From Swiss-Prot:
Name the UniProt record assigns to this protein: Thionin
Organism: Pyrularia pubera (Buffalo nut)
Function: Thionins are small plant proteins which are toxic to animal cells. They seem to exert their toxic effect at the level of the cell membrane. Their precise function is not known.
Keyword terms: Disulfide bond, Plant defense, Secreted, Toxin
Molecular function, one GO term: toxin activity
Length: 47
């Protein structure tokens, strides 16, 4: 699951992932998001 700081970061992550060629980790790093193993995002990454 990916968690982002705000809507801008979430949109950035979604667009980054669209082609299906860029890994979740790279998109998360680039867009200020985190990949988590659980189901609940931390409060500082609510999106």
């Amino acid at each position: 699951k990916s968690c982002c700081r705000n809507t801008w970061a979430r949109n950035c992550y979604n667009v980054c992932r669209l082609p299906g060629t860029i890994s979740r980790e790279i998109c998360a790093k680039k867009c200020d998001c985190k990949i988590i193993s659980g189901t609940t995002c931390p409060s500082d990454y609510p999106k």
